[in-house]
């Protein structure tokens, strides 16, 4: 039976644009120049919402882990607060990669990325733009905004339009953004309103959190237009897709279609809901598969032989 590697956690920050992203860097003790994995969360999520649980397991496997919070959220910089900009979040990923590469205590030639939900979509996009990376993990990934909107139904999309219109008016009038809930009960005008969305989101919040369940409504149209799954076919290195068979937020059928286009993709499927991935038995099964994948892809200093890739269903 393997013994978990001890690690230390450090509060860090890095520059992105004119602001800073806050993060936690997990360093495995006694490992010289370890490989690294960068973790980013989903829609409005911050690193306190269980990214630490994944990062700890990776560090225990001898892999350094950087879990960061996007600008405009949590303790990262950026004004106005609660602004979700896909362009800026992708720039945060670029900045995180550059920061890891520049550190002398990490192996710049062995870097992976890990994203969950909306961040899983970002990991697909970022992987397609950074061929120098070694591996990627896309956990219950958001792959197609149109498919997600259709899964919710047209009435749900229509309910958010008045709030979106008011937020765009606030831009013109230079007023504070008009907010919309990230997660809400079924039928509510929220970005996620599946039956498990609100309780699932709240289950990820640590005690005493100051997390705000809201985001500037102007993001809604850009989410619908965001289809990161389309670039999966451009990813040159191994990527692991962890797919929920009962996902209420990111339709699994569409995710699987895109995952099959990744030349070196691996697929793992789970009978657990979108928000179940972060806790309990589902988390244990998931993180075990992810540790195996990342260890396999990052431990060798030489490029993996493409013929050794495994596609599991």
Regions from the PLM with identified roles:
Residues 271-313:
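Catalytic active-site module of serine/aspartate enzymes centered on a nucleophile-bearing elbow/loop
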Residues 44-56, 70, 253:
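The serine-hydrolase catalytic nucleophile loop
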Residues 1-32:
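N-terminal cap/lid segment of alpha/beta-hydrolase-fold proteins
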Residues 235, 241-243:
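Short beta-strand/loop motif that positions the catalytic acidic residue
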Residues 248-254:
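Conserved alpha/beta-hydrolase "acid-adjacent" motif
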Residues 124-204:
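Alpha/beta-hydrolase-fold enzymes
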Residues 17, 47-50, 73-108, 112, ...:
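Catalytic nucleophile-loop/oxyanion-hole region of alpha/beta-hydrolase
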Residues 57-77:
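Conserved alpha/beta-hydrolase
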């Amino acid at each position: 039976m393997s013994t978990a590697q001890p690690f230390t956690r450090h509060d860090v920050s890095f520059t992105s644009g004119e602001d800073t992203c806050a993060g936690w860097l997990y360093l495995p003790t006694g490992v010289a120049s370890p490989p690294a994995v960068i973790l980013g969360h989903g829609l409005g999520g911050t690193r306190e919402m269980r990214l630490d649980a994944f990062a700890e397991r990776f560090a225990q496997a001898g892999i350094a882990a950087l879990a960061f919070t996007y600008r405009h959220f949590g303790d990262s910089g950026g004004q106005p607060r609660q602004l979700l900009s896909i362009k800026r979040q992708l720039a945060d990923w670029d900045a995180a990669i550059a920061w890891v590469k520049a550190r002398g205590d990490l192996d710049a030639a062995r870097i992976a990325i890990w994203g969950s939900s909306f961040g899983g979509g970002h990991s697909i996009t970022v992987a397609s733009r950074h061929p120098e990376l070694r591996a990627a993990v896309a956990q219950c990934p958001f792959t197609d905004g149109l498919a997600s909107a259709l899964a919710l139904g047209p009435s749900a999309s229509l309910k958010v339009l008045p709030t979106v219109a008011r937020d765009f008016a606030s831009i013109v009038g230079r007023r504070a953004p008009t907010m919309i809930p990230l997660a809400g009960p079924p039928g509510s005008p929220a970005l996620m309103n599946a039956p498990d969305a609100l309780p699932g989101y709240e289950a990820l919040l640590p005690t005493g959190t100051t997390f705000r369940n809201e985001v500037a409504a102007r993001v809604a149209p850009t989410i619908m237009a965001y289809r990161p799954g389309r670039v999966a076919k451009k990813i040159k290195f191994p990527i692991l897709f962890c797919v929920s068979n009962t996902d209420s937020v990111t339709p699994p059928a569409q995710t699987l279609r895109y995952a099959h286009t990744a030349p070196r993709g691996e697929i793992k499927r789970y009978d657990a809901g979108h928000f179940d991935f972060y806790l309990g038995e589902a988390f244990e099964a998931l993180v075990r598969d992810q540790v195996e994948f990342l260890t396999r892809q990052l431990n060798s200093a030489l490029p993996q032989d493409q013929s050794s890739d495994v596609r599991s269903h």
